[in-house]
Amino acid sequence: MRHRKSGRQLNRNSSHRQAMFKNMAGSLVKHEVIKTTLPKAKELRRVIEPLITMAKEDSVANRRLAFARTGDKEVVGKLFNELGPRYEARPGGYTRILKCGFRAGDNAPMAYVELVDRPVVEAEEEAVEATEE
């Protein structure tokens, strides 16, 4: 029986799951939006939300904990220098999950995971900047 067991197994062993969410958390911090399956997206929330909460208070101990959970200095830098200050006033709920249909190969439900309050650059502005250069 699986009574009181939290978290999804996702047909992986524990080390594979841990490595996958470490990579996904790093990608989400770097790109601020990623596309994945809906169950992975829901489980990723449990990984990334505590990281951002930790990044609100910049200390050596917190940076070391964040590095242990992401394994990437660039990600830790962005967490503490950009995301921590950005979400200083927000008491949780830093991510948004948007369903986006089903994958063509296996009909798996797909979703975008994005950070809320992220600066969105319009496609038209990018095109104008590219033509000016």
Curated annotation (Swiss-Prot):
KW Amino-acid biosynthesis (keyword) present: no
Keywords, comma-separated and alphabetical: Ribonucleoprotein, Ribosomal protein
Gene3D superfamilies, per database record: Ribosomal protein L17
Transmembrane intervals: none
GO BP field: translation
One Pfam family linked to the record: Ribosomal_L17
Keyword Ribonucleoprotein attributed: yes
GO annotations of cellular component type: cytosolic large ribosomal subunit
InterPro entries listed in its UniProt record: Ribosomal_bL17, Ribosomal_bL17_CS, Ribosomal_bL17_sf
Disulfide bonds: none
Gene Ontology molecular functions: structural constituent of ribosome
Subunit structure: Part of the 50S ribosomal subunit. Contacts protein L32.
Entry similarity comment: Belongs to the bacterial ribosomal protein bL17 family.
Protein name: Large ribosomal subunit protein bL17
